[in-house]
Regions:
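Sec-dependent N-terminal signal peptides
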Residues: 30-34
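Short, glycine-/small- and polar/acidic-enriched structural segments
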Residues: 47-181, 190, 197-203, 217-219, ...
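Bacterial signal peptide processing site
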Residues: 41-43
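Secondary-structure end/capping motifs
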Residues: 239-316
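C-terminal motif of bacterial Sec signal peptides marking the signal peptidase cleavage site
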Residues: 36-39
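Conserved C-terminal helix/tail region of periplasmic/extracytoplasmic solute-binding proteins
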Residues: 310-332
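Bacterial N-terminal signal peptides that target proteins for export
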Residues: 4-28
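Pocket-lining segment of extracytoplasmic ligand-binding domains
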Residues: 112, 183-272
């Protein structure tokens, strides 16, 4: 008579569990690991709903971009929820190349530069004008004679303003002799040495020339209410439904304008030194523009720049002021 081993039988029977469940149990540790990793994995976020909008803009040291820098330094953009990166350039060519390569969302530039970029195929436009002064400086602090030469950078705002400043004299027969000097610091140095007779300079370089005692200020662009610079942005950033970041950028600019108006002399001088490149001893003496809230460019000022470039045969195609402007988003 064969005796049945009940322990072995129980194991073979799985204590009453079906064999299929026992086979599944072999994979339970692996299944548990998968569930643990799934629970620990970072959840994907909706880009539009939860991520902060961000922008990267280019600028050169100047007075016109100062409100953007102040808004960034004082935490205005952080409080608005905008991640802003300002990339500083020492060359307009490098700045423009970065914009064309898609490394920037926008840049502070002049109207002539914006027209050349758009005519060259860049899908961008000016969303606002900026406040910065240019001065006609001449060697010889007290001389009233028409300068023998002008340091310029061809087809730039300096070249354009040279013609605007000298137009009355040219109408009476004066001749503007141009000397190509692309970099502003070199232009200032040559002017201080008397190697060029005149130059149009932005701040703080104009005040630096005047403070030397060797140069006089003949005229300033603000006296004529001329616009010269603005914020050029990719056109897609100004489209309805996609302009939140741009709206925050301009909102922060407006709040910084208030801060600049209310700032004490010491704070204002530090900002001008840090962001406009003024020497520390002169920073408190740099004329501060009458900064205004974000305002679209004037069509007539854009038309003046376009007409001048056409006369110089510098544009690859015809442009209208409307083709140079993108709509400004609604601001609080």
């Amino acid at each position: 008579m064969m005796t049945r081993n009940t322990d072995a039988a129980s194991m073979r029977a799985g204590f009453g569990f079906p064999q299929s469940l026992l086979r599944l149990g072999r994979f339970f540790p692996l299944l548990l690991l998968v569930l643990i990793f799934a629970a620990c994995a970072p959840k994907k976020k909706s880009q539009g709903a939860t991520s902060s909008p961000s922008l990267t803009i280019g600028a050169m040291s100047s007075m016109d971009f100062l409100p953007f820098a102040v808004a960034q330094e004082t935490g205005i953009y952080d409080s608005l929820g905008l991640k802003l990166e300002i990339v500083h350039f020492f060359s307009a060519n490098d700045r423009d190349a970065a914009l064309q390569a898609g490394k920037l969302d926008g840049t502070v530039t002049d109207y002539t530069g914006a027209a050349l970029q758009v005519a060259g195929g860049l899908d961008a436009g000016l969303v606002m004008k900026l406040d910065g002064d240019f001065s006609w400086m001449a060697y010889g602090a007290t001389s009233e004679a028409f300068p023998s030469s002008f340091g310029v950078s061809s087809n730039t705002v300096v070249d354009f303003l040279t013609d605007r400043f000298t137009q009355p004299a040219v109408a009476k027969g004066a001749v503007v002799h141009r000397v190509e000097v692309q970099k502003i610091p070199l232009r200032l140095e040559l002017l201080l040495q008397g190697k060029i007779g005149s130059a149009v300079l932005p701040e703080p370089f104009a005040t630096m020339a005047e403070a030397s005692g060797r140069c006089g200020r003949r005229d300033v662009s603000s006296a004529h209410h001329w616009e010269a610079t603005g914020l050029l942005v990719k056109r897609e950033l100004a489209q309805d439904g996609n302009n939140k970041a741009l709206a925050l950028l301009l909102q922060g600019y407006n709040l910084a304008v208030i801060k600049l108006r209310d700032a004490d002399t010491k704070t204002l001088a530090r900002w001008i030194k840090d962001y406009a490149g003024a020497p520390e001893k002169l920073a408190a003496h740099i004329p501060v523009p009458d900064y205004t809230p974000a305002t679209p460019p004037k069509a007539e000022e854009l038309q003046a720049a376009i007409a001048w470039l056409k006369q110089k045969k510098a544009l690859k195609k015809d442009l209208t002021p409307q083709q140079l402007i993108v709509p400004m988003p609604a601001l609080p």
